[in-house]
Design a protein with these regions (language model features):
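Signal peptide processing junction and immediate N-terminal pro/mature segment
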Residues: 22-24
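N-terminal secretory signal peptides that target proteins for export/translocation
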Residues: 1-5
Length: 329
């Protein structure tokens, strides 16, 4: 037998050993959904907790298995700018990857969209869960992670295309391997996400050269109307990503919402969905078993959210995701 044939046989065995999930298997324990909350130690994250997130999820039948945050080391605290963002993402990745792939619904309470690579890295490097039976070699194969990116901005800019120069406007490009491989590797995201694994949702404000990049990379898109009507396009995209990937991360920048609910954001764009409309769409999305995590970023709080509308909206979105998981059979 040739070396190639032997190697092929090994990989066939490994692939056959990987688990085939039933639609109701993930995160369900005696009829309850096990949730792991991961927090950037930023006031926006803490303010969402203070808005009653935990109680609202337990009222929907969830068990909060973990509720964790992290601190930068003294050495890491010396860094600023892009380097610091990468280190923060690495800590987020470490918290998420410590969980088994089928053990928890991950709820990531993030500072800004710069935390995106950390969540993706954590899901990519998440090991097999306790119920999975795999050969030890297969456990080292990175998970294929899909991304649904709800944001009024595509965040597909690179330093060559951006008008603003904002690092937080480049995180999808970084995740796709379009620039700054050093920061991506610091976060542990390796390999980068292929463009076919990425779905841009409700993008309404882009830079001209960013649009050229989106078109060249052929990113898939769903519109505001798709979200409001829960159109067939949403189903088609979920089926497509479910076939391509092992787990799907749903990322939400709160500026995706109607400006009336996030007036303190600073980067709002007109004609966004209400939080209830998006929560209803998330309920549909999370009925698909590959939907493994939801992340909430850039939530206005304190004086920028005097009536608590933004924080209540954030809680509403996570509730929508949990309702979807509850509908899995």
């Amino acid at each position: 037998m040739t070396t190639i044939m032997k190697t092929s046989g090994i990989w066939v065995c490994l692939l056959l050993a990987l688990p085939q999930f039933s639609e109701g298997q993930q995160y369900l324990n005696a009829g309850e959904v096990d949730v792991a909350i991961v927090r950037n130690p930023f006031m926006a994250s803490e303010s969402i907790l203070a808005e009653g997130l935990v109680d609202s999820l337990t009222a929907l039948g969830a068990t909060i298995g973990k509720n964790e945050t992290f601190s930068l080391t003294e050495e890491e605290e010396a860094y600023s700018g892009w380097a610091r963002e990468a280190l923060v993402s690495r800590h987020i990745a470490d918290l998420i990857s410590a969980n088994g792939r089928n053990e928890y619904l991950t709820v990531a309470l993030l500072g800004s969209c710069s935390d995106l690579p950390g969540v993706l890295s954590g899901l990519q490097n998440m090991g097999p869960g306790q119920e999975e039976q795999v050969y030890h070699l297969a456990a080292n194969i990175p998970n294929r992670v899909g991304l649904i990116y709800f944001d009024a901005h595509a965040d597909v800019n690179t330093p060559e295309t951006t008008l603003s120069g904002m690092y937080g406007g480049m995180d999808v490009a970084l995740a796709a391997g379009l620039y700054n491989d050093n920061n991506r590797l610091i976060t542990g995201l390796d390999p980068p996400l292929p463009p076919s694994y990425i779905l841009l949702a409700d993008v309404r404000d882009t830079d001209p050269r960013e649009v050229e990049l989106i078109e060249r990379m052929q990113f898939e898109i769903i519109s505001t109307d798709d979200i409001r009507t829960q159109s067939e396009n949403v189903h088609a995209q979920m089926k497509r990503l479910s076939e391509l990937t092992d787990v799907i991360y749903i990322h939400i920048d709160m500026d995706v919402l109607a400006p009336e609910e996030v007036s303190g954001h600073g980067l709002t764009a007109p004609d966004g969905p209400t939080s209830q409309e998006l929560a209803d769409c998330l309920e549909l999305i999370f009925q698909y078993p590959k939907a493994a995590a939801i992340g909430i970023a850039s939530t206005p709080y304190g004086p920028r959210d005097p009536d608590h509308l933004s924080r209540q909206a954030a809680v509403r979105l996570v509730q929508g995701a949990l309702r979807g998981v509850n509908k899995r059979t």
